[in-house]
């Protein structure tokens, strides 16, 4: 006697879903799930923070330097941060490298603390808004460093905060400050980037590396080419760092961008200055009828705001 086995339901067939043939379904899932989640949580728009995953809080970086002074050893850097192994360097060189790294970590920790403070100020302000939807929610890539600092500051202010994490073989794990219901894990970078761009009304770029540059220039390009059907405020934080990394004036001089394009960027060096830029711009462009110094108005009734709760996709990108 034979037993008939029912075939696996297609949507429960894990090998198929993880196969090349199932890729389109995986991509679609990374589009539909965040959309459903943001509707359920009544998220209208966001302010996105970009920056290095490698910066630590000031107290943590200071303890590491103190430990190095006391014992000659500090918390080792992740493998992807280490440019050489002990086999490549002599003992004295290794010790000096560790000290240089520890001192740099303390110096760069100011950006962690500044991102934390800015996120706090922004969230504290948005929580005064009388709205059925959450406005200008602090959003990060969900990992450590500047991402953690942004989520941490927003959480400390008592607000919701979003983490759009990416699954990587190293470095990236969701930080503990993300609102649990707003922590999303992505496999595809391009879908994660879509959600950074889709709801954001402003971008704050802290010092960072390849990933930060990639994310910043993609959104800068979308803004320059007017592919975003909305006003996007871009704040570049830490002029000393960025002036060493970028020479945008050279692009103008060589004719590869227009001088007018430089106006897309606003530079700031303190959390208070960055917050002032964001508050003025967000109020002017996205809170109709509200003066920068006034209290928050009743729920805005513009078409984009109304469509954000409908089944249709709101027209924030062309």
What is each PLM-predicted segment?
Residues 3-8, 14-164:
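Glycine-rich beta-alpha loop segments
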Residues 27, 117, 121, 149, ...:
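Alpha-helical scaffold segments in soluble metabolic enzymes
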Residues 39-42, 129-133, 155, 175-178, ...:
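Solvent-exposed alpha-helices and their adjacent loops that cap or buttress functional pockets
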Residues 64-67, 155-156, 218-223, 250-253, ...:
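Short, solvent-exposed amphipathic alpha-helical segments in soluble enzyme
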Residues 134-137, 230-233, 262-265:
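Residue-level recognition of the N-termini of beta-strands and the immediately preceding loop/turn
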Residues 139-206, 210, 217:
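Phosphate/pyrophosphate-binding betaalpha-module
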Residues 158-171, 206-207, 220-244, 259-260:
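Short, acidic/small-residue loops that bind anionic groups at enzyme active sites
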Residues 236-318:
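C-terminal functional extensions of proteins
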């Amino acid at each position: 006697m034979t037993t008939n086995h029912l075939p696996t339901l297609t949507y429960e067939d894990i090998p198929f879903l993880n196969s090349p043939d199932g890729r389109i379904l995986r991509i679609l899932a990374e589009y539909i799930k965040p959309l459903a989640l943001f509707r359920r949580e009544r998220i209208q728009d966001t302010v996105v923070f970009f920056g290095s995953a490698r910066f630590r809080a000031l107290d943590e970086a200071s303890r590491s330097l103190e430990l190095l002074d006391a014992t000659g050893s500090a918390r080792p850097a992740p493998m992807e941060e280490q440019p050489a192994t002990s086999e490549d360097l002599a003992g004295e060189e290794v010790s000096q490298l560790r000290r240089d790294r520890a001192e740099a970590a303390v110096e760069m920790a100011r950006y962690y603390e500044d991102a934390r403070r800015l996120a706090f100020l922004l969230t504290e302000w948005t929580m005064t808004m009388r709205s059925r939807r959450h406005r200008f929610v602090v959003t990060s890539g969900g990992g450590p460093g500047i991402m953690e600092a942004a989520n941490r500051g927003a959480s400390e202010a008592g607000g919701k905060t979003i983490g759009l994490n990416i699954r990587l073989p190293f470095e990236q794990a969701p930080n503990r400050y993300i609102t649990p219901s707003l922590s999303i894990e992505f496999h595809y970078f391009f879908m994660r980037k879509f959600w950074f761009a889709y709801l954001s009304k402003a971008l704050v770029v802290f010092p960072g590396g390849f990933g930060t540059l990639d994310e910043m220039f993609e959104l800068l390009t979308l803004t320059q080419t007017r592919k975003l059907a909305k006003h996007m405020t871009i704040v570049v934080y830490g002029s000393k760092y960025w002036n060493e990394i970028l020479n945008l004036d050279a692009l103008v001089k060589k004719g590869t961008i227009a001088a007018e394009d430089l106006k897309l960027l606003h530079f700031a060096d303190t959390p208070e200055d960055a917050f002032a830029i964001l508050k003025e711009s967000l109020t002017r462009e996205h809170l109709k009828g509200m003066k920068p110094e006034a209290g928050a108005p009743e729920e805005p009734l513009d078409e984009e705001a109304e469509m954000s709760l409908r089944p249709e996709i709101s027209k924030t990108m062309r």
